A protein has these predicted regions:
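Non-catalytic terminal/accessory segments
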Residues: 1-259
Length: 259
């Protein structure tokens, strides 16, 4: 159903047909800017979506247009509490666990992304739960469960520009808790001879605990990775693209629980 919304939003700006052909997408985009079209770009995951606009006036147009479209075409009502216009130059917006803000850098605005406060609270709660489990049963399996959790949140949030600052703070907040709980059951220090998976994913300069022969992944050791646009070649449905898809999946999943 919401695919109709995707196509409609794109048709209002990105795929709007122009009378005269242009040699490049940039030329066509500049031509559209000289019209009265609503410039906007849809970002959607399931039923959670945002439309990015250049200014408040355009955002007002989009807000009312989308509200009417959902009401008339899809028979859906928007929530006034959840659906609002946010000036990213002045305050943050939240999307899929991330915070987004447009910060000034020289003469331009750049996206500054972090982790939603509620999500950080849940990360700390889950980390404490897993550490308590290791304390009560210091087995390799429980250590691997903790590593799987750390690797998962690192992989998801490493797209945030502030991910290193956010996780450094999380590690600082949890440091005393982890140390006091694991000191009686583990060995603390820099990994002397970590396994290949640890070397591939993390640096040996961070102190961590060794539990039943397994080094725990350090929470603070993560850095931002640029988010690239989706490539149509990343599909398993053609022979050539299927090879790329398989290799990509292998890189992602290889050694997640091995330490």
């Amino acid at each position: 159903m919401l695919n109709d919304l995707d196509q409609w939003v794109a048709g209002q700006w990105e795929t709007f047909p122009l009378t005269n052909p242009y040699s490049s997408d940039d030329s066509a985009r500049h031509a559209k800017k000289r019209t009265n079209l609503k410039e906007g770009y849809l970002v959607r995951y399931a039923d959670d979506f945002k439309i990015l606009c250049k200014d408040g006036k355009t955002a007002q147009k989009w807000y009312h247009a989308v509200r009417l479209y959902l009401k008339d075409r899809l028979k859906l009502d928007i929530s006034p509490e959840k659906s609002q216009i946010v000036n990213l130059r002045k305050r943050e917006s939240e999307f899929l666990g991330f915070t987004i803000r447009a910060n000034k850098k020289r003469k331009k605005r750049v996206a500054r992304t972090g982790i939603k406060p509620d999500k950080k609270r849940k990360i700390k709660e889950e980390a404490r739960k897993l550490i308590r489990r290791i304390r009560s049963s210091p087995s390799a399996l429980n250590a691997l469960r903790f590593n799987s959790f750390v690797l998962g949140i690192h992989y998801y949030f490493k797209r945030a520009t502030k991910v290193n600052l956010e996780f450094s703070r999380l590690a600082y907040d949890l440091r005393a808790f982890i140390y006091n709980h694991l000191r009686p059951v583990g060995k603390y220090g820099r990994p002397a001879n970590p396994p290949p998976t640890y070397k591939k994913l993390y640096h040996s300069s961070f102190k961590t605990f060794q539990i039943a022969g397994v080094y725990l992944f350090p929470l603070a050791d993560v850095k931002t990775v640029n988010t690239m646009g989706f490539s149509p070649e990343m599909t398993p449905f053609t022979k050539k693209a299927g090879i790329k898809y398989t290799k990509s999946c292998a890189r992602i999943s290889n050694g997640k629980l091995v330490s």
